[in-house]
Amino acid sequence: NGNLLMPAFKNAHTHSAMTFGRSFSDDLPLQSWLYDKIFPLEAKLTAEDIYHLSRLAFLEYLESGISACFDMYYFPEAMAKAAVDAGFRTVMCGAVNNFKESPALLDEYYNTYNNHHPLVSYQLGFHAEYTTNRSIMEAIAALAEKYKAPVYMHASETESEVQGCIGRYGMTPTALFEQLGLWNYGGGAFHSVWVSNEDLNIYKKHGVYAVLNAGSNAKLASGIAPVEKMLQMGIPLAVGTDGPS
């Protein structure tokens, strides 16, 4: 009847509960959008909000042929309940930064939600270098060593992010993450737009996934990831939507 039976899509990077910000402040670059618009709103969200906002996203995913997502957000208890109630598979990822969550909570969540429900699992992660101080990143690297686990974060999404990291540490975010031991057991870098050849060699060395979000990068005019070069180098790739806002 003209139908196609195939495996479902998997959304490799998203912030599902950000359905609250859809079509909100669409004309701003990333940093202004985050700090001036999104972060102040996120500070007001409750666990109940996250449940309903996530469940809306999960139902939209299912309608679009997406059966699982890799979800970086807050209130994992609410995210997990929304996933189970919707019959949707979710891999939750830590979103630690300077003003939300902590390495201690990340440790707790890792143990709790990897033994919670067959549809739910949890990975170590933090938001990004520019929102997370060195001591927090070092503590997360220690957790990666403790659990022999991969670590995931936003990386090299914009040119200003990379230049800011070079100004703070004298190296790119990718080089910093390697120096700290965050990728000793692999992981993933969300966006990976402004990456150098040296950065890509680090990805290849540690088996780090470049998790691409072309639609989000186009909307924010962040740039275009060097996908052809990544493919030529044999770097593992995955594709995500980024947040629905």
Where are these regions (language model features)?
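Metal-coordinating catalytic core of metallo-dependent amide/deamination hydrolases
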Residues: 78-196
